[in-house]
């Protein structure tokens, strides 16, 4: 597969011919320009209100080692946007930092008998040097690390504000547990029943854990996606919508009859189909829910206990699988259907989840496949209450769930489903046994982690006072410096629990003995607000400067991988909405526009050590230069598509860059020369390139901009060479070379800066300003008409855009190439599509 994108004029090839390119030295440029940029503070925003502001942000990296090919692609994309907006005259904030808390650092510390900070900050230094070499146009004065106490002080401060609003709370619940890492996982961190990070099968464990009440914001998180539509990828919005999972239906109250010494109990279920209540033939509670133990009779208790042990070993994916045979245990109890008074046997089963809905369901096997599978396994009744025109589910084994009219449903008989649902809800509400309700798949965010290298939770547990937040003036609660190596090994409880001098403190309220909370926060908490801190990272009176925050927020362009669609992006939206509700910011969405870059593959597969198909970024940079690697990443495909490194050619990019750089060497006219006196054809190409590039950049079609740039370089070289090399004196050549330098600076900043310098301009080309174009020069004097004989191209004619069909036909027939192809044959027909095509069919 070629890396050369199709343009309007065909495939743009990387130019390799031309003058001697040996004097082009990427190593010399990479050594020269970074210090100049730093001294001039080229990438530091003025931030004085004199220019319109734009905020461009790449998802900040985790310091797991040096930069890799994925970083090279993602950060090149964001850098193009930032550099383009600067050229357009905006004051651009493009900061950089590190998401530096996390489990890999802790595991590295255990392996090396060190403190996690040593590994973390050594890697940060390595990555920072690589980012600078890679010419990322970041404002380094705003650099931050989430593991710095001056950062996580404000993470803790925000946690307290959430706590005060009832949005941070603790509860006992079954949680996802990774046996290898000995820590809990949020639902979003479990993939196909396994730990997202290490791949170990996840089990369930009951723990007292901290949660953020993200469900309070479910409606807004869903509804506000409308304002992101058209600016975020549709697949990201679809993934978030499905994860939030809003379902409209009803809460229905069932009475569980008393049995033996077990009293009667009211249990509420959520259903999207209250119209099918007459079809309920049994009742199911989640086997792992406390309710199951509460309901079971003594006769069935032992069977339930054994079954619950089996369920503990199953992942959520396995429990909800449609392929597994259904299992369950009868509890010995019966639920009363509120509409018809029928008694339904109550079962405990694994296919119902304790933390979804209410942890209990009314089972309607005729119209739900999982219920039907369960009913067939345990020989329970199946009663159809919706006539869809299909065969009886009790016979076919296939539940029906389409449109239809109600049957076997008392007063609901004969109603279509759309009318039966609100009618059933009205009946329930009138008799006080149910109500309309909206349910969400989204569950509250589990944020506790039993690990060391994270933000400590700023809560003190006092025997007398209960939970006591650490006073603001005592923040940050810092991590103890003396824990390292084996002290951090997974033990099922947080390593912080072993730091007795750290744990045992005085209660801020009663001054009695108390203990710190020993869990740390999920690292996604740190990354849910970092974009706000970048606005004023040195501010000491709050998480950000209230006088500055609304000048920059929301982020205008956010760049990162689609793998963060549910986790980071959803959490960041939640945090932003809460902080907005606290009255701290005007924006209630963090990112106005989102660009998801594709993956970098090798041989059609993701790069990995196990496959042995990794490509070392450092080696590529050393061999071809930063600019060639950046340009290859951009040119290889549209930003959102994958790049297969096996199919691309950094060497071709390097040759093109040398050819572009040579243009500046060959310009002999003085700066400021009147381009209007130069070659009009070249000027037309230059101005069309400027106009087209701007339009393409505005729509993130970066690869096509590079193709247009290649065409301009070729046209400029052609003009220079047309006068036996003396064409460099043509002021139109200078104009073209300067345009090349400015546009190229977005993709290949070292080469462009060197060109700008050779052309007689002071540094930096990054602030040169986007070149203007003359509309009159966008009108082409000629267009290329393709002449085909029997479907094969035989000639190309430069003609007026206004040429008529008759004139174009005559020119085509008069062509020597066409006459040679006809070889004396007559003509059956001539098809003319002026001004671009003539197709001649011989007799």
From Swiss-Prot:
<feature type="binding site">
    <location>
        <position position="609"/>
    </location>
    <ligand>
        <name>ATP</name>
    </ligand>
</feature>
<keyword id="KW-0963">Cytoplasm</keyword>
<dbReference type="Pfam" id="PF09334">
    <property type="entry name" value="tRNA-synt_1g"/>
</dbReference>
<keyword id="KW-0436">Ligase</keyword>
<dbReference type="Pfam" id="PF13603">
    <property type="entry name" value="tRNA-synt_1_2"/>
</dbReference>
<dbReference type="InterPro" id="IPR009080">
    <property type="entry name" value="tRNAsynth_Ia_anticodon-bd"/>
</dbReference>
<dbReference type="GO" id="GO:0005829">
    <property type="term" value="C:cytosol"/>
</dbReference>
<dbReference type="GO" id="GO:0004823">
    <property type="term" value="F:leucine-tRNA ligase activity"/>
</dbReference>
<dbReference type="InterPro" id="IPR025709">
    <property type="entry name" value="Leu_tRNA-synth_edit"/>
</dbReference>
<feature type="short sequence motif" description="'HIGH' region">
    <location>
        <begin position="61"/>
        <end position="71"/>
    </location>
</feature>
<protein>
    <recommendedName>
        <fullName>Leucine--tRNA ligase</fullName>
        <ecNumber>6.1.1.4</ecNumber>
    </recommendedName>
</protein>
<keyword id="KW-0030">Aminoacyl-tRNA synthetase</keyword>
<feature type="short sequence motif" description="'KMSKS' region">
    <location>
        <begin position="606"/>
        <end position="610"/>
    </location>
</feature>
<dbReference type="InterPro" id="IPR014729">
    <property type="entry name" value="Rossmann-like_a/b/a_fold"/>
</dbReference>
<dbReference type="Pfam" id="PF00133">
    <property type="entry name" value="tRNA-synt_1"/>
</dbReference>
<dbReference type="InterPro" id="IPR001412">
    <property type="entry name" value="aa-tRNA-synth_I_CS"/>
</dbReference>
<keyword id="KW-0648">Protein biosynthesis</keyword>
<dbReference type="InterPro" id="IPR002302">
    <property type="entry name" value="Leu-tRNA-ligase"/>
</dbReference>
<dbReference type="InterPro" id="IPR015413">
    <property type="entry name" value="Methionyl/Leucyl_tRNA_Synth"/>
</dbReference>
<dbReference type="Pfam" id="PF08264">
    <property type="entry name" value="Anticodon_1"/>
</dbReference>
<dbReference type="InterPro" id="IPR002300">
    <property type="entry name" value="aa-tRNA-synth_Ia"/>
</dbReference>
<dbReference type="GO" id="GO:0002161">
    <property type="term" value="F:aminoacyl-tRNA deacylase activity"/>
</dbReference>
<keyword id="KW-0067">ATP-binding</keyword>
<dbReference type="InterPro" id="IPR013155">
    <property type="entry name" value="M/V/L/I-tRNA-synth_anticd-bd"/>
</dbReference>
<keyword id="KW-0547">Nucleotide-binding</keyword>
<dbReference type="GO" id="GO:0006429">
    <property type="term" value="P:leucyl-tRNA aminoacylation"/>
</dbReference>
<dbReference type="InterPro" id="IPR009008">
    <property type="entry name" value="Val/Leu/Ile-tRNA-synth_edit"/>
</dbReference>
<dbReference type="GO" id="GO:0005524">
    <property type="term" value="F:ATP binding"/>
</dbReference>
<comment type="similarity">
    <text>Belongs to the class-I aminoacyl-tRNA synthetase family.</text>
</comment>
């Amino acid at each position: 597969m070629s890396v050369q994108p199709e343009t309007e004029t065909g495939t743009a090839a990387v130019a390799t011919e031309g003058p001697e390119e040996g004097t082009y030295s990427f190593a010399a440029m990479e050594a020269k320009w970074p210090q100049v940029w730093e001294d001039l503070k080229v990438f530091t925003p003025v931030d004085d209100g004199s220019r319109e502001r734009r905020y461009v942000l790449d998802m900040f990296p985790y310091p797991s080692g040096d930069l890799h090919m994925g970083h090279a692609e993602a950060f090149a994309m964001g850098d193009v946007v930032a550099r383009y907006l600067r050229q357009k005259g905006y004051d651009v904030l493009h900061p950089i930092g590190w998401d530096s808390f996390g489990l890999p650092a802790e595991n590295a510390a255990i392996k090396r008998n060190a403190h996690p900070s040593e590994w973390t900050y050594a890697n940060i230094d390595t990555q920072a040097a690589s980012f600078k070499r890679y010419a990322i146009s970041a404002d380094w004065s705003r650099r931050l690390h989430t593991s710095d106490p001056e950062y996580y002080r404000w993470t803790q401060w925000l946690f307290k504000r959430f706590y005060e609003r009832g949005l941070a709370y603790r509860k006992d619940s079954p949680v996802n547990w990774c046996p290898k890492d000995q820590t809990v996982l949020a639902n979003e961190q479990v993939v196909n029943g396994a730990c997202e990070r290490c791949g170990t099968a996840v089990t369930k464990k009951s723990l007292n854990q901290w949660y953020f009440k993200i469900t309070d914001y479910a409606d807004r998180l869903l509804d506000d996606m409308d304002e992101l539509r058209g600016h975020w990828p549709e697949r990201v919005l679809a993934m978030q919508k499905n994860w939030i999972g809003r379902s409209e239906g009803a809460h229905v109250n069932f009475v569980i009859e008393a049995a033996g010494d077990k009293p009667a109990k009211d249990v509420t279920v959520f259903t999207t189909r209250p119209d099918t209540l007459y079809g309920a033939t049994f009742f199911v509670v989640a086997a792992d829910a406390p309710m199951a133990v509460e309901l079971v009779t003594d006769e069935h208790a032992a069977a339930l206990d054994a079954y619950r042990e089996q369920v503990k070993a199953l992942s959520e994916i396995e429990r909800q699988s449609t392929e597994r045979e259904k299992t369950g245990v009868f509890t010995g109890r019966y639920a009363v259907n509120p509409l018809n008074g029928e008694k339904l046997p109550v079962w405990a089963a694994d296919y119902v989840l304790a933390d979804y809905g209410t942890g209990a369901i009314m089972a309607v096997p005729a119209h739900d496949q999982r219920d039907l599978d369960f009913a067939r396994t345990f020989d329970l009744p199946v009663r159809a209450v919706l006539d869809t025109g299909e065969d009886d589910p009790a016979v076919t084994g296939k539940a029906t769930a389409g449109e239809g009219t109600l049957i076997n449903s008392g007063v609901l008989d004969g109603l279509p489903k759309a009318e039966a649902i609100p009618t059933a809800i009205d009946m329930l509400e009138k008799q006080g046994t149910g109500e309309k309700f909206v349910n969400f798949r989204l569950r509250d965010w589990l944020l506790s982690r039993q690990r060391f290298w994270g933000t400590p939770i700023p809560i003190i547990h006092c025997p007398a006072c209960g939970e006591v937040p650490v006073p603001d003036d005592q923040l940050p609660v810092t991590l103890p410096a003396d824990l390292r190596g084996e002290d951090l090994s997974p033990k099922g409880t947080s390593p912080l629990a072993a730091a007795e001098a750290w744990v045992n403190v005085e209660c801020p309220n009663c001054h009695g003995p108390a203990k710190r909370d020993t869990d740390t926060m999920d690292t996604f908490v740190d990354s849910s607000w970092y974009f706000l801190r970048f606005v004023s990272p040195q501010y000491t009176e709050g998480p950000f400067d209230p006088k500055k925050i609304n000048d920059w927020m929301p982020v205008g362009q956010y760049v990162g991988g689609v793998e963060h669609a549910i986790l980071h992006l959803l959490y960041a939206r939640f945090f932003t909405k809460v902080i907005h509700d606290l009255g701290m910011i005007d924006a209630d969405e963090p990112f106005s526009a989102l660009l998801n870059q594709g993956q970098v593959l090798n041989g059609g597969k993701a790069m990995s050590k196990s496959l042995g198909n990794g490509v070392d970024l450092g080696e590529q940079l050393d061999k071809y230069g930063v600019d060639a690697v950046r340009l290859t990443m951009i040119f290889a495909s549209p930003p959102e598509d994958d790049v297969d490194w096996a199919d691309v050619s950094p060497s071709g990019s390097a040759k093109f860059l040398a050819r572009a750089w040579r243009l500046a060497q060959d310009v002999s006219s003085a700066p400021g020369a009147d381009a209007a006196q130069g070659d009009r054809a070249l000027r037309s190409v230059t101005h069309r390139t400027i106009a087209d590039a701007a339009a393409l950049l505005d729509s993130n079609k970066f690869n096509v901009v590079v193709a247009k740039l290649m065409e301009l370089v070729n046209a400029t070289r052609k003009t220079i060479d047309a006068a036996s090399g003396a064409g460099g004196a043509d002021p139109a050549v200078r104009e073209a070379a300067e345009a090349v330098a400015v546009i190229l600076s977005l993709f290949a900043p070292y080469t462009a800066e060197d060109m700008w310098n050779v052309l007689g301009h002071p540094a930096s080309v990054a602030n040169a300003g986007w070149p203007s174009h003359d509309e009159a020069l966008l009108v082409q004097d000629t267009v290329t008409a393709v002449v085909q004989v029997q479907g094969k191209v035989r000639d190309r004619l430069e003609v007026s855009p206004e040429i008529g069909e008759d004139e174009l036909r005559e020119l085509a027939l008069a062509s020597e190439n066409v006459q040679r192809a006809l070889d004396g044959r007559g003509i059956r027909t001539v098809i003319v599509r002026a001004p671009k095509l003539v197709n001649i069919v011989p007799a």
